[in-house]
Amino acid sequence: MEHGGDLSKASAHFGDPAGGWVDLSTGINPRPWAVDAALLDGLHALPDSARMDALLRAAANAYGVGDPGRVVAAPGTQALIQWLPRLYPAGRTAILSPTYGEHAAAWRLAGHDVVEVGALPAAADFDAVVLTRPNNPDGRAPGRADVAALAGEMAAKGGVLVVDEAFADLDAAASVAAQAERGLVALRSFGKFYGLPGLRLGFAVTDPTTAASISEALGPWPVSSLAADIGAAALADGPWQGETRTWLAENARRLDTLLTAAGFDIVGGTDLYRLASRNDAMTLYEKLGRAGIYVRMFPAQPSWLRFGLPGSEEHWTRLERAMQP
């Protein structure tokens, strides 16, 4: 399956650019949370209960959840995406699409009958429903009331609603994680907003019983001491979070201006990426790649390109120049 961020693949296709790559192919914050050197001590220790408890308390507080027992830490949300379908009996699963393709792949692999749908489905028709909110790649987000109603209906019939909130840190008030009770599992990514994807850290927020089942499936030491220490500190850094949301919003608007001037229509996105459409998008994809600008293309939607945010003025300048006719 195609994913952004694979610069070795980009180099194999385009060659190595003289000035290095400007990687705009992911939805990752280009200005990461600064890791204090003291936190690196976690490299020398096994994850102990105190570290894990501190991480879960920080996550529960950051996500508006009162009980840390409703939060499970994992080595990235991808691990949760892989494991969750195996915790439920095989049945009919609706995936709100188009979206992150690993959801459908994981549920199919676990033996579920996957149906890709374009709108929130009726709970009566499915045993599980999966949606990404805000969605990747177009940023759409069903209303919180609609999501809560569907979660209640799924819970009443013994089903589950999985809400992938990988980009929800951009607007904490829009998250449904605090509502995650029986029948609702919210997935929260750490690496995207905090700009530390290599740390491999993510969370599931749900009811305590389901949380215990997920934790048991993941086994002991699901995340490293390093990830626990850095995650706990970053999740508690409210001032950085507020400043970062402002910076990302400003730069997303700047990206809108650049893309519109280059003849794109903005399809949607979040403050970490923009999905844009142009008839000759594939031609421009090749042009940008030869200039060392790596963006995300979609073979099934050849008029679409997804752009992450440049992280420096040099990268903005290179993108602007590469966009010129």
List each language-model region with its residue ranges:
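N-terminal "arm"/small-domain region of PLP-dependent enzymes with the aminotransferase-like
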Residues: 1-51, 58
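Conserved PLP-binding catalytic core of the aspartate aminotransferase-like
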Residues: 249, 259-291, 309
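Conserved PLP-anchoring active-site segment centered on the Schiff-base-forming lysine
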Residues: 86-108, 113-115, 119-120
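Active-site phosphate-binding strand-loop segment of PLP-dependent enzymes
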Residues: 115-170
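Short, conserved charged micro-motifs
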Residues: 35, 122, 126, 280-287, ...
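Short loop-beta-helix segment that forms the pyridoxal 5′-phosphate
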Residues: 60-83
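PLP-dependent enzyme catalytic core of the Aspartate aminotransferase-like
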Residues: 143-145, 290, 300-325
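PLP-dependent aminotransferase class I/II
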Residues: 184-260, 264-266
